[in-house]
């Protein structure tokens, strides 16, 4: 009996180790080309509006994919979906590396990578829930969370060094390391019984078309793209009201409190993602820093601080409540953006401090948004509601990156607002920082006031 227990425990630990590896490289995949965006723009002679699609393409299929994999996990089984995700992710990596000299091929590769990598966050938590004993699940979730935080922390430093001393194209090969998990996970995970069920393919296609064309509009400002996007969303809304098992529950749209929380949370997440994508351009243009310096000196301390801020945020939520922590997070974000607006041309290390507080504020916000949003849901709405929040969070990051890329390409924004003498290279970035601050303040105030007066029990 003890031998059987030891073997079972060993199997669970082995599963957890390989899940941690998948989680780590899933995070690296998200940010792998972020610090290299200026280099990519220079190599292809493209404006930020086009170059940022290197990240937007990944986040688009990644966000949609997380929702799709989650819904398919019962019908097709975790084992099959994980294998499919890993293979597709690696296939995208190979295409991107081999075809890195062709911009359209690079974008296509990032679409493919996102479609594969989406399996990792969507299914890792399901594997833990199904395979890890109840008494050890808390530790397992905590370990995976720590691995993700570590990936977010060391990622910019690693990719910055590789891009600077070798070439940014080699960053596309990093996700290939996940292929080593395949034989072990296939052996450790059980064969699952497939459950028949309906899958809303038409709904996914309509929503995806609407999202893609909206993002194209934000980077090109072509009205035709906006018209196609609006029409797709209108048909999508009509569709989900008719089908029995829609991709998105239309009943959630009637929950105004929930929708405000999801929308404002998404705006905050998207704004910060857009800012982070702007940092490499800003540091190159204003302070002439190298890719290695941007990754390891400017961004690295901020990403590492997320671990500390996440821990502090959790303690404050228990002691003072989520709205108190949300207020602090919004204050960190808005004040940081406003301070950077005035002092952007000072020494480059100043931006390191700004990023620490920006990502700290984001950590606080991400800690509490799920808590306050879930309070507006009925018990039977919880699963669909939290899935929609998760989907919106990922999607908003891709949308934010696309929008900021478009804004960086608008000459009208490259105007002087401050009366004092500032370097011309700071005009565009300072104006956007002021815009970011305003967006954060409005979104934060709306969320806090709406939920404060809702009398919800957090």
Curated annotation (Swiss-Prot):
Q: Name one Pfam family in it.
A: MFS_1
Localization, per the record, is:
Cell membrane
Transmembrane annotation, as ranges:
12-33, 81-100, 111-129, 140-162, 165-185, 201-221, 223-240, 256-276, 297-317, 324-344, 346-365, 432-451
> What InterPro entries has UniProt attached to this entry?
MFS (IPR011701), MFS_dom (IPR020846), MFS_trans_sf (IPR036259)
> Which keywords label this protein?
Antibiotic resistance, Antiport, Cell membrane, Hydrogen ion transport, Ion transport, Membrane, Plasmid, Transmembrane, Transmembrane helix, Transport
Instruction: State a single Gene Ontology molecular function.
Output: antiporter activity
| Membrane topology summary | Multi-pass membrane protein
Presence of keyword Ion transport = yes
Q: What does this protein do?
A: Resistance to tetracycline by an active tetracycline efflux. This is an energy-dependent process that decreases the accumulation of the antibiotic in whole cells. This protein functions as a metal-tetracycline/H(+) antiporter.
NCBIfam families for the chain: tet_MFS_L, tet_MFS_L_K_45
Q: What is this protein called?
A: Tetracycline resistance protein
Species of the source:
Streptococcus agalactiae
């Amino acid at each position: 009996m003890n031998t059987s227990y030891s073997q079972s425990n060993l199997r669970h630990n082995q599963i957890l180790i390989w899940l941690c590896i998948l989680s780590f490289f899933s995070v690296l995949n998200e940010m792998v080309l972020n610090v290299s965006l200026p280099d990519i723009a220079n190599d292809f002679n493209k404006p930020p509006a086009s170059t940022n699609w290197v990240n937007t393409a990944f986040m688009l299929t990644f966000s949609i994919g997380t929702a799709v994999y989650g819904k398919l996990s019962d019908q097709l089984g975790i084992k099959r979906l994980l294998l499919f995700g890993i293979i597709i992710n690696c296939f995208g990596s190979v295409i991107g590396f081999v075809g890195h000299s062709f911009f359209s091929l690079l974008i296509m590769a990032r679409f493919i990578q996102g479609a594969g990598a989406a399996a990792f966050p969507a299914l890792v938590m399901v594997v833990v829930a199904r395979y890890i004993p109840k008494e050890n699940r808390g530790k397992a979730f905590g370990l995976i969370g720590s691995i993700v935080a570590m990936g977010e922390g060391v990622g910019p430093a690693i990719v910055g060094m590789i891009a600077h001393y070798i070439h940014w194209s080699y960053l596309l090969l990093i996700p290939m390391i996940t292929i080593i998990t395949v034989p072990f996970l296939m052996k450790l995970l059980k064969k699952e019984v497939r459950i028949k069920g309906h899958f809303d393919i038409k709904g996914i296609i309509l929503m995806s078309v609407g999202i893609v064309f909206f993002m194209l509009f934000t980077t090109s400002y072509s009205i035709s793209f906006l018209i196609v996007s609006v029409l797709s969303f209108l048909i999508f809304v009509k569709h989900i009201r008719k089908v029995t098992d829609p991709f998105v529950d239309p009943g959630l749209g009637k929950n105004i409190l929930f929708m405000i929380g999801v929308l404002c949370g998404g705006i905050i997440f998207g704004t910060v993602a857009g800012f982070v994508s702007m940092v490499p351009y800003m540091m190159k243009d204003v302070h002439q820093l190298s890719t290695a310096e941007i990754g390891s000196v400017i961004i690295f301390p901020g990403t590492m601080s997320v671990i500390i801020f996440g821990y502090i945020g959790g303690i404050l939520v228990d002691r003072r409540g989520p709205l108190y922590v949300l207020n602090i997070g919004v204050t960190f974000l808005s004040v940081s953006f406003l301070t950077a607006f005035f002092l952007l041309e000072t020494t480059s290390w100043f931006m390191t401090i700004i990023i620490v507080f920006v990502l700290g504020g984001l950590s606080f916000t991400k800690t509490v948004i799920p808590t306050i949003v879930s309070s507006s849901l009925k018990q039977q709405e919880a699963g669909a509601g939290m899935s929609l929040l998760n989907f919106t969070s990922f999607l908003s990051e891709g949308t934010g990156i696309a929008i900021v890329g478009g804004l960086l390409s608008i000459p009208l924004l490259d105007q002087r607002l401050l009366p004092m003498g500032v370097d011309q290279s700071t005009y565009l970035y300072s104006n956007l920082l002021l815009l970011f601050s305003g967006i954060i303040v409005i979104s934060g105030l709306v969320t806090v006031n709406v939920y404060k007066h809702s009398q919800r029990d957090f």
